[in-house]
Amino acid sequence: VTAFASTTDNSSTVHYGIINSPEWSQMTRIERVAACQLPAEELHNLVTDELVQVVLDYPFFVDARAFNTNREGFLRVLAESTALQELLNREDNVDSLISRYATTDVETVAATLSEDNDFSELWKLEILLAQPEFSNLMDEQQVVKVFEIAEEKHEAKCSNPELYQGVTGVFYQSVNEHSGASTYAYNSYVQTP
């Protein structure tokens, strides 16, 4: 079984339409991962901003949070997602990720979260931007911009602790995992009055 793109009434493309099919519930995890691999030609034809959306929508991206570190989780998703592999090959990948991160509104995301509130696109973007595969491509201005945006998002998430508990410091945690940096700290505990 292969993944397929379908068009909805509002003309937005759903790249992982297979997850809504009757076959999905009958598949093993290996078959599901295989079904979520989009054809190379389709990936090549996407502009980078669209490709970022496809990466964020990857049904198994959530698995990144099931590992001891965000780095280990990222590497698993990278190994399994041809869309993420394609994103790494784009010259404008960092610009697209930074732009998406900057324009993702914490309040809007919080308002649309379901019970799976930890699984918003914010933490996905934060994990991606903190990985050396992307951060090593950044110039000094981009690094400064990412940290400025991260600080802004962190403060906004901290103002909604009931929604973002456990994921307020994903960016800083991810940076610290592979850099050994201690300049930026994150709270790994909840403070109560």
Q: Which stretches of residues belong to each language-model region?
A:
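Non-catalytic all-alpha helical scaffold/repeat segments
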Residues: 20-23, 27-193
